[in-house]
Amino acid sequence: MLPLGEVKLTRKIQSLSIIFRTNTNIEIWDQNKKRIFEKPKIEYALRCLNSVIKSIKKTKELMPDTLIKFQVIDDNSSDENLKKLKDLINTHSIESEIINHDKSEHKEKIAAENNQETFGNLSSLLKCFEVAKKDQSDLIYFVEDDYLHYEHSLVDMLNTYERVSSQHKDEIIVCPSDYPFNYMNNEKTNILIGSQQHWRTITKMLCTFMISKKMFQKHIENFDKTCEKRHEPFEKYLNKILESEIGISPIKSLAIHMTNVNSSYGLSPFIDIKKLWEENKIRQ
């Protein structure tokens, strides 16, 4: 980017751990609404998993020195659905680990919930955080099974992380989605230049985000509190991190949250969602 001059990259990424959290049995947690395209949940999980794997392969091609670890945390999928997930991973010949999570292991750590789906959601998220605590990767990307990625998404996120954190001289949080709720109030934001597009600072996030192991450890209490019980909003303690740290999201979106068309947490603006959806169809 010639007009911007040279940015000296002092924060180089050596390794990335991707923790993909899936539950193929619940259509939309905490809602009765239908997702865009109104397909069974397994279809979203498969296409979103496919998109993430394609993005991993592109990253390995363009950034061969960056080590990538891929883990799937599965929350009680049926044998049939779990086989579909495994078959897709095997088709891509990508190294991975699938962890079959049993939510009963957290019955002493999470407050009892009237809704078992809520308990399961908290438990699988806590499992992701527990896995991350043991991980030694430079960056950790927590990603849910209803985020549809572009092939170039991970490369852009990693390059932007290096650029912005080098300029900021500190760690940052990178969210892949341009959520509608970012535009629903008069909140001021800063516009930044990433590797390929503009980004904006944010004060709210959901449970799909990229964070350094260093920052994750720094705010470990917030991550633990997030899963102790159902908060309002759900991400209350994640958002508290953004009160003292810089978080950014892309303009335009690098991953689409495949929710209901009217959800403020969902479909990003100015994206050909149908095209991206079809590009990630699983070919039998």
Language model segments and positions:
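Active-site-proximal specificity loops/subdomain of glycosyltransferases
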Residues: 33, 78-137
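Conserved catalytic core of nucleotide-sugar-dependent glycosyltransferases
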Residues: 111, 121, 132, 139-141, ...
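C-terminal catalytic/acceptor-binding lobe
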Residues: 213-284
